[in-house]
Amino acid sequence: MKGSDVKVAPVIAIVICFAFVSLGDIVSLKTKAKFPSLAVAIVAYLIAIWCGMPKTYPDVSGLAALGDILFPVFVAGLATSILPISIVKNWKFIIIGCIAVLAGFLCTVVVGGLFYDPREMFAAAMTTCGSGLTGGLIVLDRLKGTGLTEMVTIPLLLACTIDAIGQPVGSLITRKYAGKLIASDAYLTDKIVDHSDGGKLNKWGAPFNSSENPSPRFCAWIPPKYETEAVAFLQLIVVTALAMWLGGITGLGWSIVLILLGFGGTFIGLFRMNMLDRTQTGGFVMAAIYALLFQMLNDMTLQEIMAKIVPLLLVILLSGVGLVLGG
């Protein structure tokens, strides 16, 4: 009987999947995130299956299926992680970020398209310039939905490893702009404004423009005593379902609609900040998403990865150059 065909108990499968996730977390903490958790977990999983470990663990555990379902909920949680007032105060950051992303995207598609399939470069650029793992999984979902499964290799590899590359670039751009802010005393000015706005309270006693009432104008809809973990999770699931429906009838796709609904819901008082954290399920949701990636990687061989090394490095190089120049 082949190792990949071995039947395993769901509980054992869950233990194995969580072991890889935990290993990634431990190594990331030990190395101060020099080796990101996801990259470590992915490398460990690939080595294990190439050495004969059964590939059935993500499926038998049920985590991969949950990851597929919960990933949009994770995106909904991300959409509630920014204070509306921060968007206004940090408009320079946003403009610089948009220019950098556009430059990186165009550099990857235009220059990379001269050497490889432009469609493949487009999908890769959406991953490197579209918020890493989150953008990569959205791209993979769209590729599979349109039947372009032959183009998933590079976006999948990038989704698993891009944080290890993107974090230093993001840090460079942030330090570059932060230096200008400090030099112009803009940072201190923002701090003074923050303190002067802190006295206005909503009817529940929480300050406006705070994590408990992110909206600058509207009171939180749900009284704090009723926003339990289950209620917070229900809010995320409802807005996710609404985004799926609206994305289908408008053609915009669920991800764009979900981000807009998340931002809008935060502004009008429907959501508080960091809704996924309030459900106390963030760790489990991420473990399920990791298992989903494990499942996607099951059929990937070392030879296939080596064959994509050159275009993979080209995408990372072009995206990095574009992001730095644009920022």
Map each language-model feature to its residues.
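Short alpha-helical transmembrane interface motifs in multi-pass membrane proteins
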Residues: 8-9, 55-60, 89-93, 120-122, ...
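Alpha-helical membrane segments and immediately flanking helix-loop junctions
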Residues: 115-152, 156-157, 161, 169, ...
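Structural signature of multi-pass alpha-helical membrane transport proteins
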Residues: 2-65, 78-80, 203-304
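Juxtamembrane helix-boundary/capping and inter-helix hinge elements in multi-pass membrane proteins
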Residues: 32-34, 80-87, 115-121, 141-152, ...
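Transmembrane helix-loop junctions in multipass membrane proteins, especially transporters and channels
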Residues: 29, 33, 54, 109, ...
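Hydrophobic alpha-helical transmembrane segments in multi-pass integral membrane proteins
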Residues: 52-54, 108-113, 138-143, 148, ...
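Long hydrophobic alpha-helical segments that form multi-pass transmembrane helix bundles
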Residues: 153-167, 171-221, 225
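Entry/N-cap segments of selected transmembrane alpha helices
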Residues: 65-71, 78-110, 156, 231-235, ...
